[in-house]
UniProtKB/Swiss-Prot annotation:
Residues 3-147 form the Globin domain. This is Hemoglobin subunit beta-2. The gene is Hbb-b2. Involved in oxygen transport from the lung to the various peripheral tissues. One of its GO terms (biological process) is oxygen transport. Keywords: Acetylation, Heme, Iron, Metal-binding, Methylation, Oxygen transport, Phosphoprotein, Transport. The modification N6-succinyllysine is found at residues 18, 60. Heterotetramer of two alpha chains and two beta chains. GO terms for molecular function: heme binding; metal ion binding; oxygen binding; oxygen carrier activity. InterPro entries: Globin, Globin-like_sf, Globin/Proto, Hemoglobin_b, Hemoglobin_oxygen_transport.
């Protein structure tokens, strides 16, 4: 559960409406793979991840990034029940994929960076603070199965 003020909820909702999931998801996942190269081990089937330009232009990275942002969007619709919303994804990433749960926090931070880039001056410090709360809540929910 994420506790947002009414102003934070409004900021998140208004700004999220401006987001293009095709762009933001792939860019955020791409940044994760470039900035934290050890995360690439979970994406062996994605082909060429040999350089930043290869990663950022990789269609499989973009497609999976869109899936990530689509799931994130579901979380935004269910801020009062993030653990329930992400229960099956938490189980998948824990039991089958064996993803280090710290990577969820890193990806959340990458999403915030990309949102700042795409939203420009509209992404105020207050808006960033609200989104940081959201991505922290999502990361905690995704890591729930690990506890």
């Amino acid at each position: 559960m994420v506790h947002l003020t009414d102003a934070e909820k409004s900021a998140v909702s208004c700004l999220w409406a401006k987001v293009n999931p095709d762009e933001v998801g792939g860019e955020a996942l791409g940044r994760l793979l470039v900035v934290y190269p050890w995360t690439q081990r979970y994406f062996d089937s994605f082909g060429d991840l040999s350089s930043a330009s290869a990663i950022m232009g990789n269609p499989k990275v973009k497609a999976h990034g869109k899936k990530v942002i689509t799931a994130f969007n579901e979380g935004l619709k269910n801020l009062d029940n993030l653990k329930g919303t992400f229960a099956s994804l938490s189980e998948l990433h824990c039991d089958k994929l064996h993803v280090d749960p710290e990577n969820f926090r890193l990806l959340g931070n990458a999403i915030v960076i990309v949102l700042g880039h795409h939203l420009g001056k509209d992404f105020t410090p207050a808006a960033q603070a609200a989104f940081q709360k959201v991505v922290a809540g999502v990361a905690t929910a995704l890591a729930h199965k690990y506890h």
